[in-house]
Amino acid sequence: MARVTVEDAVNQIGNRFDMILVAARRARQIAVQGKDPMVEEENDKPTVIALREIELGLVTADTLDADERQTVREREAAEIAAVAAIAEGRNNVI
């Protein structure tokens, strides 16, 4: 198991409390949403991977926010396309 000191991660984020929030969000993305880690997994748990990504400056609150906004935009575009396809199908039937 890799030993991770949180001091480097804290220095990247600014304070322990925000670091915990960012690490939890990123770990959830990796574990639940299936996002790919940006570092080697090395049999580490998602929380350790998230801390290592933060340490290296790969993940910040801003990058997580931007990623979530992009995901929402993609989901909305897919929904609009699906509704348009349904509406077009109804117009072709009439």
Swiss-Prot record:
Belongs to the RNA polymerase subunit omega family. The keyword Lipoprotein does not apply. It catalyses: RNA(n) + a ribonucleoside 5'-triphosphate = RNA(n+1) + diphosphate. It comes from the Bacteria. One of its GO terms (biological process) is DNA-templated transcription. Promotes RNA polymerase assembly. Latches the N- and C-terminal regions of the beta' subunit thereby facilitating its interaction with the beta and alpha subunits. It is an enzyme of class 2 (transferase). Disulfide bonds: none annotated. One of its GO terms (molecular function) is DNA binding. It comes from Shewanella sediminis (strain HAW-EB3). Its EC number is 2.7.7.6. Keywords: DNA-directed RNA polymerase, Nucleotidyltransferase, Transcription, Transferase. This is DNA-directed RNA polymerase subunit omega. One of its GO terms (cellular component) is DNA-directed RNA polymerase complex. The RNAP catalytic core consists of 2 alpha, 1 beta, 1 beta' and 1 omega subunit. When a sigma factor is associated with the core the holoenzyme is formed, which can initiate transcription.
